[in-house]
Design a protein with these regions (language model features):
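Second-shell loop/turn segments in exported
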Residues: 110-116, 125-128, 148-154, 174-184, ...
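Preference for extracellular/luminal or secreted protein segments
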Residues: 2-168, 405-483
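Glycine-rich, aromatic-flanked loop segments that form ligand/cofactor-binding clefts
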Residues: 195-226, 246-266, 287-312
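Short acidic, glycine-rich surface-loop motifs adjacent to enzyme active sites
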Residues: 108, 164-185, 263, 268-272, ...
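Active-site-proximal loop/short-helix segments
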Residues: 221-225, 260, 264-278, 282, ...
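Second-shell residues forming the walls of enzyme active-site clefts
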Residues: 133, 154, 186-197, 286-450, ...
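Solvent-exposed loop/turn segments at secondary-structure junctions
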Residues: 146-151, 180-184, 213-218, 261, ...
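Hydrophobic faces of well-ordered beta-strands that scaffold small-molecule active sites
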Residues: 139-146, 173-177, 207-213, 261-264, ...
Length: 483
């Protein structure tokens, strides 16, 4: 009998029971991989086959039984909904503040105003989060490629039963698409619409459907999809009005296709007159003005955006292998050069800020070689506490050489959350990264409260997005929220 999508809820409950048993025998990672392999067979899979594979994994796990219980979860950590509803207050991550991040970091805020609140607290959030399992919470913190979701090395250009079943087991927070996934407008609309439907069926929440649409050399959609023109490089925009109109146009065509998140604009400041075409120039004040206008345009269109790459990679040096990036700027130098564009963007109101992988030794003594995306001195002390940003903090893509050359797959999500990030973008191996976070929560390395803080921000942002885009008529981009 073919796998019936109507039985997915029963399947998930059964697999969670199997997961608990497998975890107790120290074989959780194999169970996770086997259950995904079975479910992603789509229409070829059978419910009986699904159960047999899971039971077989438990039997194998029993052979590797660990009598000392090393790595086994406590009974109170079983994969079940939380017993009480968490607070919906978007409190900052609890970390040890770096002494060298001076309180003067907030001085520049006055020039641009305090960060505007983009996502309002929604009364539904607490109950939604309380009803999630630990795995569902962790899944919501990942934005990954469509290939990572279904576990294939082949390019994905459609969303059918395989995607549906994969999202039922791993209801990720979002999907990011490359130009290889996008063939033409009707294909994109169908793929994104189907994915939103499957996400709602799985967890009752919409997906963040993301692209890197900066314009010019980094345009996933513009210039690639028939009928949509490339808007040109950021460096070609010299007036605030041009920047606003251009990025409002970008937001409009992305929303029309079904996307709801543009990982743009670039808020970095070039360090020479020969500006990178991805930036708005080398003058911090001009860049701040144009970034602010770009955010205003994206906000006017209704699409979510994410200025990047905090605290600014315009003046970094790169090691001999072309991997690790380092900024030797002091905090005072950042205040006058790289931070103003981000402050200007936050004053407009942005749902996301992306943190780069540069190290900042002059700002974070003791862990100066740590990438900013894993560094609480940058993420929590500077961005969250000193600059006052309370929206979602997303890592830059974690499948880059700067990360994969120094960190294992099961570390990256844990380190990002410990630093204060909320959303984990494109780890090299989604399964390993996700299981690393789940294990960290089970062991207490990441507290349930810390996990809930990020999940609450994600859910609040999705509910706000759904309200705004539904009212504007962008139904695919908005997705649905289970009532």
């Amino acid at each position: 009998m073919a796998l019936n999508p109507l039985k997915l809820d029963k399947n998930r409950a059964y697999l969670k029971q199997i997961d608990q048993q497998a975890y107790q025998h120290g074989w959780h990672r194999l169970t996770h991989r086997q259950r995904r392999a079975e479910v992603t067979l789509g229409n070829r899979g059978t419910y009986v086959g699904l159960a047999c594979a899971a039971v077989a994994a438990v039997l194998v796990g029993m052979l590797a039984f660990n009598p000392l219980g090393i790595g086994a979860p406590r009974a109170s950590e079983a994969e079940s909904p939380a017993s009480t509803a968490p607070s919906t207050h978007s409190t900052a991550a609890t970390t040890t503040s770096a002494n060298d991040v001076a309180t003067s970091a907030g001085k520049g805020t006055a020039a641009y105003g305090a960060p505007a609140v983009w996502a309002s607290e929604d009364p539904r959030t607490a109950q939604i989060v309380a009803n999630m399992t630990t795995q569902q919470k962790v899944d919501q913190l990942f934005i990954v490629s469509p290939e990572a979701i279904v576990g294939t090395s082949s390019t994905v250009t459609a969303a059918g039963s395989t995607t549906e079943n994969a999202l039922a087991l791993d209801p990720v927070g979002g999907i990011i698409y490359s130009s290889a996934n996008l063939e033409e407008a009707s294909q994109i609309k169908s793929m994104l619409s189907n994915s939103q439907t499957y996400s709602n069926e799985a967890v009752g929440l919409p997906l963040f459907l993301a692209v890197n649409e900066e314009g010019g050399s980094v345009s996933t959609v513009g210039g690639h999809v028939e009928g949509i023109a490339n808007v040109g490089d950021a460096a070609s925009l010299t007036s605030a009005n041009d920047a606003k109109n251009t990025y409002q146009s970008v937001g409009n065509y992305l929303l029309g296709l079904g996307f709801n998140l543009d990982l743009a604009p670039v808020a970095d400041v070039s360090t020479s007159s020969a500006s990178s075409p991805r930036t708005f120039g080398s003058d911090p004040n001009q860049v701040a003005s144009l970034v602010s206008a770009a955010v205003e345009g994206l906000n006017a269109s209704g699409i979510l955006c994410s200025p990047k790459h905090f605290p600014g990679i315009g003046g970094v040096s790169v090691d001999a292998e072309g991997k690790a990036m380092t900024s030797n700027a002091t905090l005072a130098e950042m205040e006058s050069s790289t931070l103003p564009p981000f402050q200007a963007a936050m004053a407009q109101g942005v749902p996301f800020v992306m943190v780069g992988h540069l190290s900042t030794p002059a700002v974070s003594s003791g862990n100066g070689s740590t990438p900013a995306s894993f560094n609480s001195a940058i993420v929590t002390d500077l961005l969250r506490n000193q600059l006052g940003y309370q929206g979602l903090i997303i890592t830059d893509a974690l499948n880059t050489d700067a990360i994969t050359s120094s960190y294992s797959n099961n570390q990256v999500g844990v380190l990002a959350l410990q630093a204060g990030c909320d959303v984990i973008l494109c780890p090299e191996d989604f399964d390993d990264a996700k299981m690393g976070v789940i294990e960290a929560v089970r062991s207490g390395k990441i507290s349930e409260d810390r996990l809930n803080q990020s999940v609450i921000r994600v859910v609040n942002t999705k509910l706000t997005m759904n309200n705004k885009l539904t009212q504007a008529g962008f139904t695919t981009a908005a997705g649905k929220v289970r009532q």
